[in-house]
């Protein structure tokens, strides 16, 4: 069914995301389903019209980087979407610039941030000591990590 569907610049999906992307993430976080956001963005990226979808393609790429970079903050404190995540996003981030007007007025000076996203996509969290070993499952969908704290996380 997805093969017959495509999204493109300034269509309903793109306009919805330009207005409500942060609200959508906040809602998913509040109902405990933030982890589904990455898969949803991936699905949208897969159905972009390659000719008429360059702007939505850049938006979704930036959106995915934004989610991956600030996942733990959004998951634990969804309202930080409107302050901490926006002001610490790279200066040229499409999400930061699209939703800059959501930054609270009480933030008088924004920190100096990188211009672009760096190479870090995601960090492992949850171990209390050095991680000494990591391995992917055979289907590449899971990652296991072993730590000096005598724990294994999947």
Question: Where are the model-predicted features located?
Answer:
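Extended acidic/polar alpha-helical scaffold segments
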Residues: 1-119
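A detector of tandem-repeat and repeat-rich interaction/domain scaffolds
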Residues: 112-154
């Amino acid at each position: 069914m997805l093969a017959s569907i495509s999204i493109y610049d300034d269509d309903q999906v793109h306009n919805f995301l330009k207005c409500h992307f942060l609200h959508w993430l906040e809602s998913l976080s509040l109902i405990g389903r933030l982890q589904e956001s990455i898969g949803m963005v991936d699905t949208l990226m897969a159905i972009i019209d390659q000719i008429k979808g360059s702007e939505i393609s850049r938006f979704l790429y930036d959106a995915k980087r934004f989610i991956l970079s600030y996942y733990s903050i959004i998951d634990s404190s969804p309202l930080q979407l409107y302050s901490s995540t926006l002001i610490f996003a790279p200066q040229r981030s499409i999400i930061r610039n699209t939703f800059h007007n959501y930054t609270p007025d009480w933030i008088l000076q924004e920190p100096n941030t990188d211009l672009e996203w760096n190479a870090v996509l995601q960090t492992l969290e949850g171990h209390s000591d050095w991680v000494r070993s990591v391995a992917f499952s055979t289907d590449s969908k899971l990652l296991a990590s072993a730590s000096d704290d005598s724990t294994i996380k999947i």
